[in-house]
A protein has these predicted regions:
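Conserved polar/disulfide-associated segments of primarily extracytoplasmic proteins
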Residues: 47-129, 134, 139, 148
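Surface-exposed amphipathic alpha-helical segments
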Residues: 142-173
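Bacterial N-terminal signal peptides
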Residues: 8-17
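Soluble non-cytosolic domains of exported or imported proteins
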Residues: 32, 79, 83, 151-158
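N-terminal "mature-domain start" segment
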Residues: 24-53
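Bacterial N-terminal signal peptides that target proteins for export
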Residues: 1-8
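Stable alpha-helical elements in mature extracytoplasmic
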Residues: 37, 84-92, 156-163
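Sec/Tat signal peptide C-region and signal peptidase I cleavage site
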Residues: 18-23
Length: 173
């Protein structure tokens, strides 16, 4: 990890209420949002308030992991109605489109609130999958970001994607 990126991540963690803990069962938004993570995912950031955020590092066993950060975040923001939810999603998508080397990917046609794209972080191509739900007065964002190519191979990427989909299936109910 280059020094600048290291300092940015360190500062974000310190400002965000740094928490390092093994993740399993997670409850957010005063208990109205629940999900579980694989036990080897490490909670690296927790922000309480509005929005409420949890970020988990997904271990990458390869040498390329020293310069990348595979992660999954869940953000919960209070919204009063469907229009506010749509505005929240639109703002997040607009922000994603500003990332360096942004390229839209192929989302499943059955999921209108799912967005797949690639972009660069510190010169490394990343694949992002973002999903959104409106539930009980909250906009919920699940954002899964991993290097597009890891020396850990396709099996690791498939395991990462499976963990992300597992959280999505829980949040979507």
């Amino acid at each position: 990890m280059n020094f600048r990126r290291y300092m940015i991540v360190t500062t974000a963690l310190l400002l965000g209420g740094f928490t390092v803990a093994q993740a399993d069962d997670v409850s957010m938004a005063s208990g109205s949002v629940h999900f579980s993570t694989p036990s080897n995912w490490v909670g690296i950031m927790q922000v309480d308030g509005d929005p409420e955020v949890r970020v988990f590092q997904v271990p990458d066993p390869s040498p390329s992991a020293s310069t990348t950060l595979a992660r999954v975040s869940v953000t919960v923001k209070q919204v009063t109605n469907l229009q506010d939810f749509n505005d929240y999603v639109g703002g997040a998508v607009a922000k994603a489109k500003q990332l360096k080397d942004y390229q839209p990917g192929q989302s499943r046609s059955s999921d209108q609130n799912s967005f797949v794209y690639t972009a660069s972080e510190s010169g490394t191509p990343y694949t992002y999958i973002e999903r959104y739900w409106f539930h009980d007065g909250h906009a919920i964002q699940l954002r899964c970001a991993r290097p597009s190519a890891s020396e850990a191979g396709q099996q690791w990427a498939a395991t990462f994607d499976k963990g992300c989909s597992s959280i999505a299936s829980t949040l979507g109910t």
